[in-house]
A protein has these predicted regions:
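Rossmann-like NAD(P) dinucleotide-binding subdomain of oxidoreductase/dehydrogenase enzymes
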Residues: 137-283, 410
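Hydrophobic face of amphipathic alpha-helices that form TPR/SEL1-like repeat modules
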Residues: 1-41, 67, 370
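Glycine-rich loop-to-alpha-helix module at the N-terminal edge of alpha/beta enzyme cores
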Residues: 46-136
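Conserved C-terminal structural/oligomerization subdomain of aldehyde/semialdehyde dehydrogenase
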Residues: 44-47, 235, 371-373, 380-495
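Short, well-ordered beta-strand elements within core beta-sheets of diverse protein domains
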Residues: 45-52, 69-73, 161, 272-276, ...
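A short hydrophobic/small-residue beta-strand
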Residues: 185-187, 365, 450
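ALDH superfamily catalytic-core signature
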Residues: 237, 245-390, 453
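Residue-level signal for inorganic ion chemistry
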Residues: 43, 81, 103, 126, ...
Length: 495
């Protein structure tokens, strides 16, 4: 049970200026520059982080390469790597509340969700891949009896990882844990707006015994640090979660440099499809509201398009409005808050523009959408439901990354499929129906990396998360994630 007094004791702890973590040491940026960290809770600065440049990235990559070639981690026995990664998981769990509160101060996620999704998920991820280290085998090819064909899986070398601001510890672990499990060294760039929890993770990894240089963390802007990692000739693989525009740029950087493998988890405009035979409309309304309004809609798999069969449209919209209206938006470190803050002033301004544009284009505002709690100095927005949305409207096509839900009515199953697949994205989706046949047909028909049936969200580490089409390539989570961080090598042996 979360204790409000413990949360309150952590929320005001001073945060010392944060340095870069390179070659197992904390050091300032080469240029001596720093960045103010603004809390979305009250709009005030509460910390400073180093602003790295190209020289710092080069130092981090050099340290990572030296560690990889030296073999302190890459050639460590799997049992040894496993032991250290399990220790990392234990330390994350031991400091879970501290990490969660720090992350909330950084990006505004409501504390109940943050505790589970950030340190809780990160610890589970490190434990999952630690246990996988000694359970992934090579292969023996079916060759002629005069030849032995062995297929080895090797670490790729140096991995660059660029992580977003919305769930930095969770998504960071999704990149780091499988990359480390495979024996790689890593250069990690957190988001400029949310770096603090990943810097703490670096300290935890060092305490757990991860050899120096195996993990390096460089903070700063995407235009400087991100570009320097993506264009570096000695980075072998780049893993990124973020916007489509940046993803395209990273592919260009790969082509301009060493043709490094680039894995992208990008945006979404995920359809949540409700048929008239959905088993429980109250549950549909509650789960669908959580699917778009948790973390103020700042979730890549958010169910931002609600496609509702026309015969139940009015009833479901009414129930959904009731659920949304009951959500308490407020201080994300207050256990009474259901929804926290928008991550930044810029993000809030963008959300408000989307809301105004939706009304201008003819959508009907059912509830919410306005900025609230402005007197706190923080960045808060009431969850918004827009009805009578057509597929031509901006709100139906573009990712908002905020608490704005577009409701679109449909008549027949074919219409639902057409609408679901009408965007450039293909990350997540859901289908609500009592018909097993309908469920199976929709799973096949909807072009998305994950199709929920009679639920939304909550998939665990046992299944991959990745997108289709312009939602990206490659997958986080599951054993399939290891494929991104390994290379195949064939030994062809004449007997």
């Amino acid at each position: 049970m979360l204790d409000q007094s413990k949360i309150d004791s952590l929320r005001t702890l001073p945060v010392t200026p944060q340095s870069l973590f390179i070659a197992g040491r904390w050091r300032p940026a080469a240029a001596g520059e720093e960045i103010d960290v603004i809390s979305p809770i009250d709009g005030k600065p509460f910390a400073r982080i180093a602003r790295a440049g190209r020289d710092d990235v080069d130092a981090a990559v050099t340290a990572a390469r030296k560690a990889y070639e030296g073999g302190s981690w890459s050639r460590m026995a799997p049992a040894g790597r496993k032991k250290i990664m399990l220790r990392i998981a234990d330390l994350i769990e031991a400091r879970a509340l501290e990490l969660a509160v720090l992350g909330v101060r950084d990006n505004g996620t409501e504390i109940g969700m943050a505790l589970k999704a950030e340190p809780g998920s990160a610890a589970a991820t490190f434990r999952y891949y630690a246990e996988a280290i000694d359970k992934v085998y090579g292969e023996i090819a079916p060759t002629a009896d005069t030849v032995l064909g062995l297929i080895h899986r090797e670490a790729v070398g140096v991995v660059g990882a660029i992580v977003p601001w919305n769930m930095p510890l969770m998504i960071g672990a999704w990149k780091l844990a499988p990359a480390l499990a495979a024996g790689n060294s890593v250069v990690l760039k957190p988001a400029e707006a949310a770096s603090l929890s990943l810097l703490q993770l670096a300290a935890i990894c060092a305490e757990a015994g991860l050899p120096e240089g195996v993990l390096n963390v460089v903070t700063g802007s995407g235009s400087q640090v991100g570009e320097a990692i993506a264009t570096h000739m000695d980075v072998d693989v780049l893993a990124f979660t973020g916007s489509n525009a940046v993803g395209r740029r990273l592919l260009e950087y790969s082509a301009r440099s060493n043709l490094k493998r680039v894995y992208l988890e990008l945006g979404g405009k995920s359809p949540n499809i409700v048929f008239a035979d959905a088993p429980d409309l109250d549950r549909v309304a509650k789960v669908s509201a959580n699917g778009i309004f948790r973390n103020s809609g700042q979730v890549c798999v958010a169910g931002s398009r609600l496609l509702v069969q026309r015969s139940i449209h009015d009833e479901l919209v009414e129930r959904l409005a009731h659920v949304a209206g009951a959500l308490k938006v407020g201080d994300p470190l207050d256990l009474a808050s259901d929804v926290g803050a928008i991550a930044s002033a810029a993000q809030l301004a963008g959300n408000l523009r989307f809301a105004r544009q939706a009304e201008d284009e003819g959508a009907r505002l059912v509830s919410g959408g306005e900025r609230i709690l402005e007197e706190t100095g923080g960045f808060y927005q009431r969850p918004a439901i827009f009805d009578r949305v057509s597929q031509e409207m901006t709100l139906a096509r573009e990712e908002v990354f905020g608490p704005l839900l577009a409701v679109i009515a449909f008549d027949e199953e074919a219409d639902a499929v057409r609408l679901a697949n009408a965007t450039e994205y293909g990350l997540a989706s859901a289908v609500w129906t009592s018909s097993l046949s309908t469920a199976h047909r929709m799973v096949r028909a909807v072009r998305a990396g994950i199709v929920h049936v009679n639920t939304y969200g909550g998939s665990d580490l046992t299944v991959p998360l990745g997108g289709h089409r312009q939602s990206g390539n490659g997958h986080d989570k599951s054993l399939h994630a290891l494929e991104k961080y390994t290379a195949l090598k064939t030994a062809w042996i004449q007997l």
